[in-house]
Amino acid sequence: MQTVTRLDPLRSAVAALRADGPLALVPTMGALHEGHLTLVREARQHAAHVAVSIFVNPRQFGANEDLDAYPRQLAGDQALLEAEGVSLLWAPEAAEMYPAGYATNVSVSGVSDGLCGAARPGHFDGVATVVCKLFNQVQPDLALFGEKDWQQLAVIRRMARDLDLVRPHVDAILGVPIVREADGLAMSSRNAYLSPAQRAAAASLPRAMQAAIAAMLDGQPATDCIARLTGEIISGGFSSVDYAELRDPDSLVPVTDPASQPARLFVAARIGTTRLIDNMPVSAG
């Protein structure tokens, strides 16, 4: 595996890989876990070579968020990626991605509104900007993202469609299902922030979501189920709920009656100082 930190050697490395066959990109912020490695393994099923980016993007963190505390473990991440057969690791510093005088921002409206877009103003502008840059830098034939960040995936697909991106084309931006711990908690780098007691309590989140979905499928009013879900999250050990909402899986517009239209349940909640997100389909399938 080749590790590069500067743009010029990245371009040379990408050109060599692309000459040998299709190239897949898995963008990450590092602190890799089994969820990330699942993306890498899926990427290998679609391409001759896999490139992974590790960049803790300062533009997607708010003023009071966890940029400085976000876990960084490059040496360990390199070892994991090498063991998975990754061909290229792109690990730039912030000054390489955003040099002096940088003045361009990518903003995607609509799907970025509400949910995490409301709770974290400016977050998706930072996401769209860095992913657009990564796509331009690596020129992948396809890119893979985890469905835990469902809204992020919708933003990236909208950006690719609206900007007529060729590499990757919007249809080659793939979502990979959420990877969960044995107790159901969605895998996340931020789980490392949790104390043992918080980690045990965090497993109540997916259980409460599953119970709410089961109640909706049983015909109970969605508003009642969401209200009960919020209370169960708090009683399970969380300190607050940023949102618990039903949205259309594609457009992300609010859904009031999941019995009559496709819906997905989205939740963001805080346990201690840690913010966790999750989402699940509301369907009998």
Tell where the protein language model's regions lie, with residue ranges:
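Short, basic/aromatic-enriched C-terminal tail that caps enzymatic domains
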Residues: V4, P254-V255, R264-G285
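Nucleotidyltransferase catalytic core that binds NTPs
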Residues: Q2-F238, R247-S251, T273, M280
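A conserved acidic, glycine/proline-rich C-terminal tail/linker
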Residues: V241-A259, L265-F266
